Design a protein with these regions (language model features):
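Exported/periplasmic ABC-transporter solute-binding proteins
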Residues: 24-57, 61-71, 78-81, 85-91, ...
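Sec/Tat signal peptide C-region and signal peptidase I cleavage site
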Residues: 19-23
């Protein structure tokens, strides 16, 4: 019995060593709004598979430019569905690999309790100096924000107060630092485990902007990579879906 136990233990050790030997580290470009949930998903993924996902956060537009310039990313989690489709068309993404991993929601937010009402009337009142918005040329959430302002017929009136950020993450930083009293950001940035972290907000009605379908795509440098394939499969799993929903996204 002891002899059998020793053999079983040795098998488990060797199997674990083999798993670690096959484990890889991959480079993943992640849309700024999805940073927090992806950090959680990446940690769970590493525990489950041994593979490590090295995350780089930023704006989708900036990632597109970097990928076109040869940046060594193997997987892109974009903040839209157009960029992955474009990369596939241009030969920088793997055909058939794109899929929607999350559907985002836009909010108007301020860290000050009661500053933003639940109908967004604060925008019409205009009693603020600066409104933070991610650059619509770089960030899909910034484009959604401008679409919402146009739908409300407020784009022209509020344009002088708009402060453009490079990414949705920076748009939030402008508000938290006091450079803007309020700003348009992703719901996920203030939502965790079914509750709002702080401040006051208006959940912008989906009818005011185009759907924010966030797609992932395997990039040319990740084609055939076992770790990349494992991560894309994990992103589609119920475990990942639970994390994604806990941050306020739809699937």
């Amino acid at each position: 019995m002891k002899h059998t136990f020793r053999h079983a233990s040795l098998f488990l050790v060797l199997a674990g060593a083999a798993l670690l030997a096959r484990a890889e580290e991959i480079s993943v470009a992640v849309a700024a709004n999805f940073t927090a949930p992806m950090q959680k998903i990446a940690a769970d993924f590493e525990k489950a598979t041994g593979h490590k996902a090295q995350l780089v956060s930023g704006s989708t537009g900036k990632f597109y430019a970097q990928i076109k310039s040869g940046a060594p990313f193997q997987l892109l989690l974009a903040a839209d569905d157009e960029t992955p489709a474009r990369l596939i068309k241009e030969g920088d993404g793997v055909t058939g690999s794109a899929f929607t991993y999350a559907i985002g929601k836009l909010v108007l937010w301020s860290p000050k309790p009661g500053f933003v009402d639940d109908k967004g009337e604060v925008l019409k009142a205009g009693r603020f100096e600066h409104l933070s918005v991610a650059n619509p040329k770089l960030a899909p959430y910034g484009l959604a924000a401008m679409e919402a302002l146009k739908a409300l017929n407020l784009a022209d009136a509020l344009q002088p107060k708009v402060v453009l950020a490079e990414s949705i993450s920076q748009a939030q930083q402008f508000v938290t630092s006091g450079n803007a009293e309020l700003g348009f950001i992703a719901y996920s940035q203030i939502h965790k485990d079914g509750r709002i972290i702080d401040g006051s907000y208006w959940l912008v009605p989906a009818r005011l902007y185009s759907p924010i379908r966030q797609d992932a795509v395997v990039l040319a440098q990740g084609k055939g990579n076992a770790a990349v394939e494992a991560l894309t499969a994990y992103l589609k799993s119920p475990a990942a879906a639970a994390v994604i929903r806990s941050y306020g996204y739809d699937r």
